């Protein structure tokens, strides 16, 4: 995220580092700006990054390298994509990040940093008779103001990408929730957003030459006619395990 100048997680990561330094390593404490600059300058495999910030049980691992009981690693998304190509009308194309082994220990020995249980836990693909690919997402916990817009955008993009590499037409993205909430420190921001006149949606276009899900790069995704209102800043609610 830092490499792509996405800084929505900066403050929380720095606060954990700062607390650790105050308690155990004061000589290496630094200001937030210096901390982020160091993260950006370091390799993802450096000791500084890997020993402190590697998230063993986070979304990507569960979806692309989910550990099985026999020691294998299962690429759930990769398998689903292959099955969609081979037998598109089956009803079992589910990808789940919810692993009971980690539900009550997400912040314990498996992770170097605290991580709450997965919020968007399960998604499923289904193909209609007219060869449209639909995507359904179940999200157990939903921060309506800050995170749900990111979830809508990212899973809609995933639908477009998977449809392209499986030779299907993109259909509908259906988003369901278990617990939907607005945090009390977001009330003013939500009121401001509700006072604004909605604008037309932008359009996403993908590089048609991409045939493999792992070959997509940032420049292969084109956003057209994006005309947003000014950004509304809000703090991330610090409620672990929510």
For each feature predicted by the language model, list its residue ranges:
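Terminal, non-catalytic protein-protein interaction segments that mediate quaternary/complex assembly
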Residues: 1-242
């Amino acid at each position: 995220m830092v490499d792509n100048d996405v800084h929505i997680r900066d403050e929380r990561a720095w606060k954990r580092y700062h607390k650790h330094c105050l308690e155990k390593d004061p000589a290496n404490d630094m200001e937030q700006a210096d901390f982020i600059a160091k993260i950006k300058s370091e390799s993802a495999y450096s000791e500084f990054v890997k020993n402190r910030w590697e998230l063993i049980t986070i979304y990507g691992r569960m979806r692309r390298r989910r550990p099985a009981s026999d020691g294998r690693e299962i690429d759930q998304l990769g398998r689903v994509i292959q099955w969609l190509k081979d037998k598109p009308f089956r009803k079992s194309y589910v990808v789940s990040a919810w692993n009971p082994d980690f539900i009550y220990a997400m912040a314990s020995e498996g992770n170097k940093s605290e991580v709450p249980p997965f919020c968007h836990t399960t998604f499923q693909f289904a193909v209609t008779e007219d060869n449209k690919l639909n995507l359904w997402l179940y999200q157990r916990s939903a921060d309506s103001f800050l995170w749900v817009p990111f979830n809508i955008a990212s899973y809609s993009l995933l639908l477009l990408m998977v449809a392209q590499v499986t030779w299907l037409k993109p259909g509908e993205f259906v988003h369901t929730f278990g617990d939907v909430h607005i945090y009390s420190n977001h009330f003013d921001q939500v009121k401001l957003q509700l006072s604004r006149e909605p604008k037309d949606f932008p359009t996403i276009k993908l590089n048609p030459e991409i045939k493999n899900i792992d070959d997509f790069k940032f420049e292969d995704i084109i956003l057209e006619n994006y005309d947003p209102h000014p950004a509304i800043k809000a703090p991330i609610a610090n409620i672990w395990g929510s």
